[in-house]
Amino acid sequence: MTENKLIYGSVSGKKVDENGEGLGGALIGLFKSDDVEFTEENALMTAVSGDDGSFVFENVPYGNWYIREIKPLTGFVLNETVYDVNISENEQVVEIEIVNKLVRGNIALTKVDAEYTDTKLTGAVFEVYKDSNDNGELDSEDELIGTLTEKEIGQYEMNDLLYGRYFVKESKAPEGFTLDEGVYE
């Protein structure tokens, strides 16, 4: 009598940022190769990446499977790439790397005359601070990261900011106007 044993392998992966640093806490799923909805409920198995970004799916049966991120870490964009893996040999280990990009954003504002709001004002300087201690208030622990650039008359912006909270404070008023003492989040 011949006994057939099922073939099982594993998928070993690493979750990293754009610089190759490991990211812990991301939810990864193993899905049937005919799945089209990549949710935690549809996953055959799930794993959470460790502090170093590593994750493992063990005892994955013979066949074709999909690996996909289900939930990224806060501040990172969901990687929607579907990784096709094939378990074809007993104790086979398939290795993959899932890269996440940081969420980036922009700050844009328009400086206008308080009395004549259709009149845009040029020549102001706005400092941008990162809320380094994440307390929601501009204080001495916050980092000055630069100033807004005036792109057009009265229109100021800063692009490609990493995920987080920022404050904008006018440091120089346009000629003939008083400084706005407000801090804007």
Where are these regions (language model features)?
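Solvent-exposed loop/turn and edge beta-strand elements of beta-rich ligand-binding domains
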Residues: 1-185
